[in-house]
Amino acid sequence: MSEGIRIRRFASSEWPAYRALRLRSLRDAPEAFGSSAEAEEAWDPALWMARLAAASVSGRDCPLVAESAGPDGAMRGLLWAKCDPEDAGIVKLFQMWVAPEARGRGVAAALVDEALAWAASIQARLVQLGVVCSNEAAIQLYLRKGFRNAGAPAPIRPGSARLEQPMALDLPRRQDCA
């Protein structure tokens, strides 16, 4: 893991911090996500609160935060892992983002490692994600972690010219999430 960074799950009570970090990610890299800062800024606070509250008890979600291990505990990145609603043996990774000041320090790799450990712990057989085709650093990270291209690139959202490459990683266990 990156020195000076710890990876943990968001607590349900941390929805304001999750909201702030998510909106920061959308503003920093608007081309990398299927949503936009404008859309999510309009969400009612109750929706943000409910999202993390549901994730904390579902057993099918793992919202992760990377934070400085020092006294400031500044949040430096996030990644959400979630069981596919139609196939409990598949975990999808989304909302991956690392703050510019923390990039190149192993934070993204640590977030992915934690998400993969969670996926293995719930007996998932496959992990899927989509990565913007122009984000070569992220693509190389996922390839180093064992992901492979899993289909043809497609628009990241309807009407977008930006393409997203689907990727997948087979896990050794072959049972469904409980």
Predicted feature locations:
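Conserved phosphate-binding and hydrolysis motifs of nucleotide-dependent enzymes
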Residues: 77, 106-108, 146
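Active-site acidic-Proline motif in GNAT/NAT acetyltransferases
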Residues: 99-101, 105, 133-134
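Acyl-donor-binding surface of acyltransferase catalytic domains
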Residues: 1-10
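Short coil/turn segments at alpha/beta junctions that flank glycine-rich nucleotide-binding fingerprints
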Residues: 105, 121-125
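Alpha-helical macromolecular-interaction surfaces
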Residues: 17, 106, 110, 114, ...
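C-terminal "cap" of GNAT-fold acetyltransferases
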Residues: 125-126, 132-178
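Acetyl-CoA-dependent GNAT
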Residues: 12-13, 19-20, 24-101, 112-114, ...
